Amino acid sequence: MKSGEPVNSHDVTDEQWEGLAQVVPLRGRDAWPSAVGHRAMPEAETERRRRFVVLRINVFADAREVAETLMAGIPVLLDLTSAEGEVAKRVLDFSTGVVFGLASGMHRVDRNVFLLTPAGTEVNGLMESAAGVPGV
């Protein structure tokens, strides 16, 4: 075998590829994140976690939106201030069941205003937990 000839039919020399395609490195060796300091898109996760929905409930039929939003992993600020007493009680009972079923959290913000949070959501600075709060 002569010098510079391919070893087998699959081996080719640089001269044979010359002019066919330009090879451009995508990143330098030091541009790749290290395993220790790398987190996959932390900004996107943080941005998603900052979002919450305010739902002002007037009729019991609106309670379904509370459940669907919380099931999607989005915190809900449940405002029952404009609902009649019996409707507010039914919606609160329903929402409590949803929170329990999803292992979520419920926090009282004000009279007839509650923050419903998906599991794993940290909440700071609220008045008290909704558990044991007398009345609606």
UniProtKB/Swiss-Prot annotation:
Keywords: Cell cycle, Cell division, Cytoplasm, Septation. GO terms for cellular component: cytoplasm. Its main location: cytoplasm. Pfam families: SepF (PF04472). It comes from the Bacteria. InterPro entries: Cell_div_SepF, Cell_div_SepF/SepF-rel, SepF-like_sf. One of its GO terms (biological process) is division septum assembly. It is found in: Cytoplasm. Cell division protein that is part of the divisome complex and is recruited early to the Z-ring. Probably stimulates Z-ring formation, perhaps through the cross-linking of FtsZ protofilaments. Its function overlaps with FtsA. PANTHER family: CELL DIVISION PROTEIN SEPF (PTHR35798:SF1). Homodimer. Interacts with FtsZ. Belongs to the SepF family. HAMAP family: SepF (MF_01197). This is Cell division protein SepF 3. It comes from Streptomyces coelicolor (strain ATCC BAA-471 / A3(2) / M145).
